[in-house]
C-alpha cells in the first residue's frame, strides 16, 4: 500500500483552493493515491440573505437544491484534474471544519490538503477559521499555506528541498520521520531546523557567556543526531537563533525550500515552543507547510 494512499482535498471553488488541489494532484499522482474532493455546503442562513431565504419553503429544499448544484460543479471541477489520478467527489451539508475532519476520519485519510484564507501582505492576520479548526482537530497531517493560489500546474510542482523544523519535544520523532520519508520519496535535500529563542541566550539585556551558547547548540545537535538515528533519517542540521516563526521562514526563503514540515499539539491544541508557534509559522512561510 502506498504511504499516502488516501488524500482529502476540500474544495471551495476559489483560486486559493485550486492551488491546493494542484498540490493534491501532484501528490496523488506520485503516490498513486485515492484523491477525494470534498465540498461542504454550509447551513442555508450562511448562503442566502434574509430576503432570499424565505423564497424557499423549508431548509431541506434549500440544502437539497444547493447540494445538487454543487455536485454538478464538483463533478465538472474533477474533470479538469490529472487523468491518471483516481478521483472521488463528495458533497455534504454541515459545518465545514467538522465535516472535513469527519470525512478524513471516516476515509482514514493520510493527508488533508487545503488552502488558508490568508493572502498578500495581510496574510499573517487571515488564517481562516475553518483551517484553524481543522488543524486543531484533524488526526492526520494537514498540508496548507496562505499562498497556494500561486501554485504552478501540477506537472510543474517539484520538491527539491524539504525543511523539517523540530523543537525536540516527544512528537519530534514523528515529525522528522514524516519529513525524512517524504524527502526520500522525491529524492530531495532535507534540512533539519531547530530554533533557540533569544530569551534562552540573553537575560535582562545581558547575553550569557558565549561558551554557554556553544554548549546549548551542542546539546541540541546531539538531540537531533539521536533522532536521526532513531528514524533512520539524515539531513543538514541548522540551528538558528531568534523568533521561531521568523527564523523558520528565513531558512525556507534563503534555501529556496519547497516544503516545511512541523509538529502541532495534540489533545487540546498547540503546545510546546515550536508547536506554540505553528500558526505563525504557517502565516510566515514562503512555501507550503505540513503540520504533523
Per-region residue spans from a language model:
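Active-site phosphate/pyrophosphate- and oxyanion-stabilizing loops and adjacent acidic/basic residues
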Residues: 25, 75, 79, 132, ...
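A short acidic, glycine-rich active-site loop
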Residues: 56-70, 209-219
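Gly/Ser-rich helix-loop-strand patches that form or flank binding pockets
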Residues: 3-5, 26-30, 101-152, 250-292
